[in-house]
Amino acid sequence: RAFSAHGLPADRFCHFARRLDFQGFLSLNLASDALLDTLEWSGGKTTLEALGCGLPVVTCPGRFMRGRHAFAMLRMMGLTRTVAADKDAYVRIAVELAHEPGLLAEMRSQVTACRNRLYRDTRFMEHLEDFYAAQVHAHVQAPNAKRRP
């Protein structure tokens, strides 16, 4: 009924899949128009794989970290067009993508163009290397200092 209320045939826009192996999951992503992120418990690896397949992701960030993963990924990519402020906006964005093939194509193109901002970001690695170097340096400077396990 929710799909019908927005003029969308549910059998075209909603698919509940059985458990899939990884290849089947990627194939489903490649055959999909967009990923609707789950509310309150955002997708992590699911979102990463969807973005890797060029799928636009519609999300509504929650109050807690568990509901903000997709938002953080999209923000890192510079793509906040599909980030909803509330549940009503989440539905509006999803319906807009379903009714406007041109917008959907534009969003897919933007995801594909920007995904390396997410996948090739080396800042975390650089910060981790700096942390390790600082810890080694601190240990060399004070080798007998008591440390917490």
Report each predicted region and the residues it spans.
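Generic recognition of well-ordered alpha-helical segments
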Residues: 31, 49, 69-73, 93, ...
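A donor-sugar binding/catalytic signature common to diverse glycosyltransferases
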Residues: 22, 27-69
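C-terminal amphipathic helix plus adjacent low-complexity
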Residues: 11-18, 92-149
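Short helix-capping segments at alpha-helix termini
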Residues: 4-11
